[in-house]
Amino acid sequence: MQKFRKEDPTFRVHRDEESNETIISGMGELHLEVYIERMAREFGVEVQAGAPQVAYRETIGAAAPYDYTHKKQTGGSGQFAKAVGTMTPFTATEDDEDKNYKFNNKIVGGRIPKEYIPAVDKGFQEAMSKGTLIGAPIVGVQMDLEDGAYHDVDSSEMAFRICAIAAFRQAYEKASPTALEPLMALEVSAPEEFQGNVMGQINQRRGIISGTTTQEGFVTVNAEVPLSEMFGYSGDLRSATQGKGEFTMEFSRYNACPRNVQEELVKEYQKQKAEEAK
């Protein structure tokens, strides 16, 4: 797989420590099928591949305040940290290095000592790695740290990091969390006689057609389609065009999921959490 990564930067591999599985990701179902087939053919490796998974994201639709105190007393020194501020939706500009997250330190008068500020920032970013709505990474969030408190003995970087994680989640629940799905830019080419079939299939997959062109008896249809609706498309297109249709697909952007899709994703995530808790 390292060989494939060197050949193709869009082919990515990582290890999921929780499930003990190797996760491969790429530009689409067909892209991954090619590499699975190559593993068997070139290296004699039998691969047990699970169903493809869509890389969903989460974001927020509204601003929300947070005011959280982390306090823990054990034998000896305890833990104390307090963070107060606001979570707001964030749209990056060209000047922003991080396009998904922004942290503003608005602390004045030493309410939180300078050495603990990076721990708060780190805690916020840690909380963003897995949202509480569907368990997906969170994007498009600005965290303003406006006030707080510390203790001379019981405060530490760890206490402020833990406080920040909890403060983030406190605000997130009130900030209208929303699931985002990846949309793909799809281009389909087929003989003109199959135009109706091609467009019908795209509509069935929640696709939005942006344009069609015809040339020398062939029609080209451009559309934006959710990735989750594209599994099995290559076979369906072959059937609908007597094997004469072709398509290309690449990532376009993330967009809010329709309500029914989000409800289904939430239900699946709750079920998964319940099974893990057993």
Model-derived regions, located:
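Accessory interaction regions appended to the cores of large information-processing enzymes
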Residues: M1-K278
